[in-house]
Amino acid sequence: MSTILKWAGNKTAIMSELKKHLPAGPRLVEPFAGSCAVMMATDYPSYLVADINPDLINLYKKIAADCEAFISRARVLFEIANREVAYYNIRQEFNYSTEITDFMKAVYFLYLNRHGYRGLCRYNKSGHFNIPYGNYKNPYFPEKEIRKFAEKAQRATFICASFDETLAMLQVGDVVYCDPPYDGTFSGYHTDGFTEDDQYHLASVLEYRSSEGHPVIVSNSDTSLIRSLYRNFTHHYIKAKRSIGVSAGESKSATEIIAVSGARCWVGFDPSRGVDSSAVYEVRV
């Protein structure tokens, strides 16, 4: 299943491997929403999907709230505005208008993602979207993906929050999947960078949440730092293709780590009040 957005680090291509390490549970919690590829490819009873990027979360909320209105407005924009001057006018309004509604900002965000250079999402220090025009002949309008997303989104809660804030909201039995900005390859985290200190802090919080009994699964690049930070997790290695961030028309592969916390019990979780599954889960390797 493809996603609404083009997105750096999109997990669609590796989903068959990633799903092997996602155990059953009443809710999947994702502190780094990205393209929502994991939500779309899994079947948890409910989801808590978070991201620090308010434009991303606003898009998801607006599609979930009124899919048909969103499709109707966005389709028109795709039909009439595939021109460089239109792109920069829309980007200007997206960045600076004080009168733009949240609904139209969501429509513009999809437009900018699909018409901007290589689907990148980048902001300057002032918080302004600054990706140049992509000059594509016929940008794809993801109507089918929007409808599928809107259906699945009825099981989800979307919040604009940091990973700290999101992980503080865990409930008994929650499964945690984290796909943070990758070490050594990508530093963008909305307007601020995602530093080595952030990697250390995230790993510390995830170690603690794992010790509480939460299944924790983390994707990241295969670097010495990541192997060290998640040394108490089981490591699985996969090859993933990269297309965003390399020369146009090219792709390359890189090794990624899927770090999986050890199997634990869901202490205090009563399946009779939630999903019909065992109180003990087993990570499949």
Swiss-Prot record:
<keyword id="KW-0489">Methyltransferase</keyword>
<feature type="binding site">
    <location>
        <position position="51"/>
    </location>
    <ligand>
        <name>S-adenosyl-L-methionine</name>
    </ligand>
</feature>
<dbReference type="InterPro" id="IPR012327">
    <property type="entry name" value="MeTrfase_D12"/>
</dbReference>
<dbReference type="GO" id="GO:1904047">
    <property type="term" value="F:S-adenosyl-L-methionine binding"/>
</dbReference>
<keyword id="KW-0949">S-adenosyl-L-methionine</keyword>
<comment type="similarity">
    <text>Belongs to the N(4)/N(6)-methyltransferase family.</text>
</comment>
<dbReference type="GO" id="GO:0006298">
    <property type="term" value="P:mismatch repair"/>
</dbReference>
<dbReference type="GO" id="GO:0032259">
    <property type="term" value="P:methylation"/>
</dbReference>
<keyword id="KW-0808">Transferase</keyword>
<feature type="binding site">
    <location>
        <position position="11"/>
    </location>
    <ligand>
        <name>S-adenosyl-L-methionine</name>
    </ligand>
</feature>
<keyword id="KW-0814">Transposable element</keyword>
<keyword id="KW-0235">DNA replication</keyword>
<feature type="binding site">
    <location>
        <position position="7"/>
    </location>
    <ligand>
        <name>S-adenosyl-L-methionine</name>
    </ligand>
</feature>
<dbReference type="InterPro" id="IPR029063">
    <property type="entry name" value="SAM-dependent_MTases_sf"/>
</dbReference>
<feature type="binding site">
    <location>
        <position position="179"/>
    </location>
    <ligand>
        <name>S-adenosyl-L-methionine</name>
    </ligand>
</feature>
<dbReference type="GO" id="GO:0006260">
    <property type="term" value="P:DNA replication"/>
</dbReference>
<dbReference type="GO" id="GO:0009007">
    <property type="term" value="F:site-specific DNA-methyltransferase (adenine-specific) activity"/>
</dbReference>
<comment type="function">
    <text>May play a regulatory role in the functions of the retron.</text>
</comment>
<protein>
    <recommendedName>
        <fullName>Retron Ec67 DNA adenine methylase</fullName>
        <ecNumber>2.1.1.72</ecNumber>
    </recommendedName>
</protein>
<dbReference type="GO" id="GO:0043565">
    <property type="term" value="F:sequence-specific DNA binding"/>
</dbReference>
<dbReference type="InterPro" id="IPR002052">
    <property type="entry name" value="DNA_methylase_N6_adenine_CS"/>
</dbReference>
<dbReference type="GO" id="GO:0009307">
    <property type="term" value="P:DNA restriction-modification system"/>
</dbReference>
<dbReference type="Pfam" id="PF02086">
    <property type="entry name" value="MethyltransfD12"/>
</dbReference>
<dbReference type="InterPro" id="IPR012263">
    <property type="entry name" value="M_m6A_EcoRV"/>
</dbReference>
<dbReference type="InterPro" id="IPR023095">
    <property type="entry name" value="Ade_MeTrfase_dom_2"/>
</dbReference>
